């Protein structure tokens, strides 16, 4: 029997103020933790950001480290735009471009707590379990219908909207996941205690 996709869905929480592009014009290390608890919606579907990673052109794990290419060109542009790429030729990943024009820094959105449009997410993922719908960068892009068509789009105009968090959150930090270069940098940020993370933070991380 197919589980009911409506009765187990709570009303979405109230949204904060929309974030403007100026929010993203700061250091990637300020933007990344400040995004924890914010809400990302794409065509009205999305949720609370619970996990992100920061990337900067000065370190070798960043796509922008070796300079601009047709693929990463948007990272070298102004802040407040999306950078969408395909990972390993399989999954789409969404980043938010940060810092001033030319700095080539971005925040990878790694996990969401689903709050808006959950039935649509379940259809797209062919999965019912809410905890697993957006528990990874590729998973959340599939759930929100994100593709290369969403690359280089402004974060403050339809179909994308990002809303500031409405209360205090406890942010934990740790090393980034799935990389071999600059793997010791503690540039992963998450919502402490969230069950929607892509992977738990180690007890030694804080």
Swiss-Prot record:
Domain of life: Bacteria
Single GO MF descriptor: alkylbase DNA N-glycosylase activity
Entry EC number(s): 3.2.2.-
Keywords annotated in UniProt: DNA damage, DNA repair, Hydrolase
GO biological process, alphabetically ordered: base-excision repair
Xref: HAMAP family: 3MGH
Recorded family membership: Belongs to the DNA glycosylase MPG family.
Protein name per UniProt: Putative 3-methyladenine DNA glycosylase
Organism: Nitrobacter hamburgensis (strain DSM 10229 / NCIMB 13809 / X14)
């Amino acid at each position: 029997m197919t589980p009911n996709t409506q009765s187990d869905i709570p009303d979405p929480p109230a949204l904060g103020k929309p974030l403007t592009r100026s929010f993203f014009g700061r250091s990637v290390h300020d933007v990344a933790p400040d995004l924890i608890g914010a809400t990302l919606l794409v065509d009205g579907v999305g949720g609370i950001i619970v996990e992100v990673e920061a990337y900067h052109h000065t370190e070798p794990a960043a796509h922008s480290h070796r300079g601009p290419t047709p693929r990463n060109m948007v990272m070298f542009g102004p802040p407040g735009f999306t950078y969408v790429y395909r990972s390993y030729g399989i999954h789409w990943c969404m980043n938010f471009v940060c810092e001033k024009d030319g700095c080539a820094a971005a925040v990878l959105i790694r996990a969401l707590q689903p709050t808006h449009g959950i039935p649509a997410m379940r259809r797209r993922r062919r999965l019912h379990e809410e905890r697993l719908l957006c528990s990874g960068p590729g998973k959340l892009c599939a759930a929100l219908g994100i593709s290369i068509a969403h690359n280089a789009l402004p974060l403050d105009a339809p179909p994308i909207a990002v809303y500031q968090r409405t209360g205090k959150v406890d942010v934990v930090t740790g090393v980034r996941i799935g990389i071999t270069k600059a793997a010791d940098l503690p540039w992963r940020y998450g919502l402490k205690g969230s069950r929607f993370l892509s992977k738990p933070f180690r007890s030694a991380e804080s």
